Amino acid sequence: NTYFGFNWMDPVVGEGKTPEERERNKKLRQAISIAMDWEEYIQIFEKGLASPAHGPLPPGLFGYREDGAAAFNPIVYEKTEDGLVRRKSIEEAKKLLAEAGYPGGRDAKTGEPLVLNLDFQAAASPSTKAMLDWYQKQFAKIGIQLDIRGTDYNRFQDKVISGNHQLFLWGWLADYPDAENFLFLLYGPNAKSKTGGSGENASNYQNPKYDELFSRMRYMDEGPDKAEAINELIKIVQEDAPWTFGYFPTSSAAFHQWVHNGKPTQVVRNHIQYLRLDPETRVKAIKEWNKPIYWPLLVFVLLSALVIIPAVALHRKRERMTARTTEEDVK
């Protein structure tokens, strides 16, 4: 999955130190989450081959239910009367931004414009300009100025490990197909800036309720209790919004007709051992594909004859005319 994260240690977009700050910062994160139109991003930059994420858990894994939290984020989306799911309006995002203390994108106390920083893991270049412009456009919709702090990847990693990042783009390719391997990305003890970089929680997100429930869920066998725990964990991070959850890429693949059990996947990387080949079908298909096709050669010969025969006749006619002219000149 690909997501847009907030550093929980940052005073503006992070957790906050007081109850008032926590509520303000949370509403700011929620406003940004609504403004980030991932449906548009998918159509422009992923050619439609992805699905918007409502939480950290992708479809297809245990714990993902179409009627559960993983499939619907009520903080960012709403359901229409006919049951369709749509992103909440920009007006709703602006309302949350005002409640966070930034009406129109300005600090209500100082009048200063709100400027946030995207720490990007590459220097700005023509190949990334369109994408970075798109991110700035999303923030501008609610009046926030987004500055791009591009740098090389090593420097970016140093900033994340030291906790000096504010907003960032990140992604995760699971090690194994289990909800634990996605939900641990938000487990407090895995905070990257607090573990010297060994943890995978790049947002440094920490919530005691989430951490306690996750520590129990990770060792549960698949069943109703684990499914309910996963559902509750997703609800917690939807409310806290440490990420705008981004999108899950769609898998695609092409297989010959003699390959069986071939299935597109984003997670399983040792899938070759599960494939079954039909050698007879393969040999038959190869023979069919390599069967000589003579009609193009015949057409070529006929066309060549239509061109060459008249050309030869014309050449001989000119030679005879030249010979007669030479004889008359001699006489």
Question: What are these model-predicted stretches?
Answer:
Residues D10-Q43, Y210-A227:
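Extended ligand-binding regions for polar small-molecule ligands
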Residues S51-A100, A122-M131:
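Structural transition elements
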Residues T2-N7, I34, Q43, G55-P56, ...:
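Structural recognition of the beta-strand scaffold that forms the well-ordered cores
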Residues L303-R318:
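Alpha-helical transmembrane segments
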Residues F4-R24, G63-I90, G105-L114, K159-G163, ...:
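Short, solvent-exposed loop/beta-turn-alpha elements that line the ligand-binding surface or hinge
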Residues R320-K331:
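Cytoplasmic C-terminal tails of single-pass
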Residues Q43-E46, A100-A122, F168-G171, Y219-Q257:
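Bilobed periplasmic-binding protein-like "clamshell/Venus-flytrap" ligand-binding domains
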